[in-house]
C-alpha cells in the first residue's frame, strides 16, 4: 500500500508522514518512508541547486528532473512493495502535477513523465492557510516557498486535486 501526503509548502507533510510511520511500526507493520524531491540523489542535488537559485531551467526541464528523481528511487519503491511494506510518501506524483500546472504545463504531458511508476492507494492533502505556512518557515526558503502568489496558486491547485 502506498500512502502519500501532499500539500503546499510547510503544510506538515513531513510531520504527518513521520507520525504515521511511528504509529504503523508500533502496530508491528513494516513501513518505508520516502520524501520527494530526494535531495540525496544526483538528480535531487541538481533540483536543490535550482530551488536555491544556483541553476536556471525552463519549467519543462525542472519537471522532467522532478520526475527523474522519482524514477531514481523506482527500484527502492519496488523493493519496499515486494517486502509488503506500507510505503509512506512525503510528496509524490501529485506534487509534480499541481506545481507543473501552476507553472503553465499541460496535465497530460506531466502525467506521462510518471507513467510506469506505482500509483498511490491513498493521497492525503493537507490544507494549511497560506498565512500560517509562511509563518512556519521564515528563513532559507526555496524558489517556490518565497513567492506568496505562487504559493496561493499551489494551495488552489491542491484543493482542486482533492
Set out the residue ranges of the language-model regions.
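Hydrophobic alpha-helical packing residues
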Residues: 20, 24-25
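P-loop (Walker A) phosphate-binding loop of NTP-binding proteins
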Residues: 8
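Hydrophobic anchor at the beta1->P-loop junction of P-loop NTPases
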Residues: 3-5
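A glycine- and Lys/Arg-enriched "phosphate-lid" helix/loop adjacent to the NTP-binding pocket
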Residues: 96-157
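Walker A/P-loop
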Residues: 14
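ATP-dependent small-molecule kinase phosphotransfer cores
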Residues: 29-115
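The start of beta-strands in P-loop NTPase/AAA+ ATPase cores
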Residues: 1, 85-86, 122
Amino acid at each position: 500500500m502506498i500512502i502519500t501526503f501532499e500539500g503546499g509548502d510547510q503544510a506538515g507533510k513531513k510531520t504527518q508522514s513521520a507520525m504515521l510511520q511511528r504509529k504503523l511500526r508500533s502496530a508491528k507493520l513494516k513501513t518505508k518512508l520516502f520524501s520527494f524531491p530526494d535531495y540525496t540523489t544526483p538528480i535531487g542535488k541538481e533540483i536543490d541547486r535550482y530551488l536555491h537559485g544556483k541553476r536556471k531551467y525552463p519549467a519543462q526541464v525542472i519537471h522532467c528532473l522532478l520526475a527523474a528523481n522519482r524514477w531514481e528511487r523506482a527500484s527502492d519503491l519496488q523493493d519496499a512493495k515486494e517486502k509488503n511494506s506500507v510505503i509512506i510518501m512525503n510528496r509524490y506524483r501529485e506534487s509534480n502535477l499541481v506545481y507543473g500546472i501552476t507553472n503553465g504545463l499541460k496535465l497530460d504531458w506531466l502525467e506521462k513523465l510518471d507513467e510506469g511508476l506505482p500509483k498511490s492507494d491513498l493521497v492525503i492533502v493537507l490544507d494549511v492557510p497560506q498565512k500560517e505556512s509562511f509563518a512556519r518557515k521564515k528563513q532559507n526558503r526555496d524558489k517556490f516557498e518565497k513567492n506568496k502568489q505562487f504559493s496561493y496558486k499551489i494551495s488552489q491547485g491542491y484543493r482542486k486535486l482533492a
